[in-house]
Amino acid sequence: MSAGWVAGAVRAKALVGRYPGAAGAREVAACDRLGDALRCLAATPYSRYARTAVGLPEAQRAVTATLLWHLRVLAGWLPRGGARLLVPLAAGFEIANVASRLPAPGGRRAESPQPYRLGALETAWRSLEHAATPGELRAALVASPWGDPGGDTPWALVTGMRMAAARRTAVAVPPARRWAQGRAVLLTAREQFVHQRSLLEPAQRHAARLLGGRASAAASYQEFR
């Protein structure tokens, strides 16, 4: 192992060691009031952003922004080219950026937070952020490593990106394959058995590669299980 990878491994262990872990997460979840939860976070690395949170959306954003910041820090410690392993793991932040630009249910556009700053962990955000319509977003995705989501409706764009991210994670980071498969299971089940709509072809293809053809083509929840 090169010195660069050793430095990255040491940094990763240091970051993990500072986090509250499962016990801390349960403690925060058990808080009756947001103020109590924020006080719990104040003693953790999440305080970097949580100290200015005044409501639940801001607190949630503080937690995710801290995670992204530490992924970017870790990427900076890895040797040249090593950050590519973290790009699929940061895909959710790019998806959130895209989702915030899409019309909310009913056609209205909700107030959007500032986009996450991805730095070296972006997949294609610098192209996607200039898209003014769902059709332009789809075209930008087609021309990027994300690939075609199969449609330009908000649900098609976001679901297509999420399934593509699961597939990319499984390929680029083999130890995370089970996480990626779990994500694909939840996405497939939600679309087919909650919303009663079939996955579009690109997402269906990714799901089949992750879960097998029988699961992705199941006609009932019992068969899917």
Model-derived features: positions:
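N-terminal domain-start signal
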Residues: M1-R225
